Amino acid sequence: MESENKNNNKKVKEESKVKVKFITNDANIRVTDTPIAVPVRLGRLGLSEVIHHLREEENETSKPFDFLINGKFIRTTLDKHIKNANLSEEQIITIEYLEAITEPKREKECQHDDWVSCVDGSNFGLVVSGSYDLGVRVWGYDGELISTGTGHLAGVKSVCWISDKNADNLSFVSASMDKTLRVWNFNKSQSEIKALACLKEHTGTIESVYVSPDSSRIVSASMDSTIKLWSIKDIPNQHATTSSSIEKSNSKKRRLANNTNNETAAVDQQSEIIHNITESLASVTVPNSQGVTVVNWTTQFQMLSGSMDSKIRLWDVSTLVANDTIPTPAPLTDLDYSMESGLIVTAHKDRIVRIWDPRSSDETKSQTQSLISHKTWVTSVNWNPSSKYHCCSTSHDGTVKYWDIRTKIPLYTIDTLEKSKDKVLSSSFISNKNKNINDYSIVSGGTDSKLRIHYNDKQEQQQ
């Protein structure tokens, strides 16, 4: 009899349950929010089966979900998670669920003649890439090469689309080791790239270029320790001719384009007429920076920079004064700002991805999280444009990692260069739908001279 009681007690313990209420922001997968009792031994897969049962989806039980309690992912059993979070099993626990993001299964490789150092997929369904082969290229969402532009005299380090309401004539800017910026026109109907202007004032390699949210200005950062602002209004559009007068701004006054001491017309390697601009709108030297590696915008009134002196700086655009400086533990190689959350994600030489809240008044608390998974130097970071939680990172370890900042473990890792010792240098998000986080795929480039588009499985199913 005593043995039977022990077995019964053991059985009761194994079947301990807790009352939970499931909630989601996705109406397509919503179930009843009436509290139900579930075994505390369940983990992510067991809870996924519960959701499928409530939705009466017997044929979709293999599709996993992710679950969060108070904003923290469940990565153990319910029992362990509840204890670690100091929650009570006597109360009803609210569990948020969402479709799990899985590793892309399809990939398109796009060959270059040298390292692919930079990519930008922010223009609807198009990717622009820059390479150490001196060229810039525009690719379609399907990985088809549309056009190539040449003119730089050294490797291209950074590229950025310039938003344009004209859907046929687009433009983008590139930055190079030849110390110049070039602005290009891309005519979609003619599948043709033409150079519009060459911006010359930096005295060192230009590491980063970015366009303001209102597409009125370009900011560039260089190893010469300067940040420069350029007015897009000063750059002739695709219809300009050699005889047109081009107005140029600077911080004190405006001069006409026929002043050949400041601007002249020149012919590049493709025999296209381009316009040399030799004075920026404004410039600032970042003292003791050891070189500025990256620039970005928060709004059209504020910029961000990262540098080799391990500091993030927030700049007032109107004065080019750094209103705030955030010290970091290691030199910065890249950063990105989230319009959704107001957070900054940074890449560092010490292999760590870090998340910062620039709104924090205490600089020791402004770092909200460290994401540690890469084995060596992190080269690029990007926020998913439609999510306050998701970002990607690339590294010299040959991987692309996709993160949800509510957990310290990557949602998935793409080993892009598993058969070689090549490095991943750059990344961006691309979409041809632009609706939500599931409509974005990742594009990356590296030292194997290939651009890769890692297609989001859910987006592919919607094509």
Swiss-Prot record:
One GO term of the biological process aspect: response to mercury ion
Region of interest (Disordered), ranges: 241-262
Induction section of the entry: Up-regulated by phagocytic stimuli.
WD repeat intervals: 111-149, 151-194, 201-240, 287-325, 327-366, 373-413, 419-463
InterPro entries tied to this protein: G-protein_beta_WD-40_rep, NLE, WD40/YVTN_repeat-like_dom_sf, WD40_repeat_CS, WD40_repeat_dom_sf, WD40_rpt, WDR12/Ytm1
Record-level Gene Ontology MF annotations: ribonucleoprotein complex binding
Keywords tagged on the record: Nucleus, Repeat, Ribosome biogenesis, rRNA processing, WD repeat
GO CC annotation terms, alphabetical: nucleolus; nucleoplasm; preribosome, large subunit precursor
Family matches, as Pfam families: NLE, WD40
Main location: nucleus
Phosphoprotein found in the keyword field: no
Annotated spans, Ubiquitin-like (UBL) domain: 16-99
Subcellular location per the Swiss-Prot or TrEMBL entry: Nucleus, Nucleolus; Nucleus, Nucleoplasm
Highest taxon listed in the record's lineage: Eukaryota
Similarity remark: Belongs to the WD repeat WDR12/YTM1 family.
Described purpose of this protein according to its UniProt entry: Required for maturation of ribosomal RNAs and formation of the large ribosomal subunit.
HAMAP family: WDR12
Name assigned to this protein: Ribosome biogenesis protein WDR12 homolog
Organism: Dictyostelium discoideum (Social amoeba)
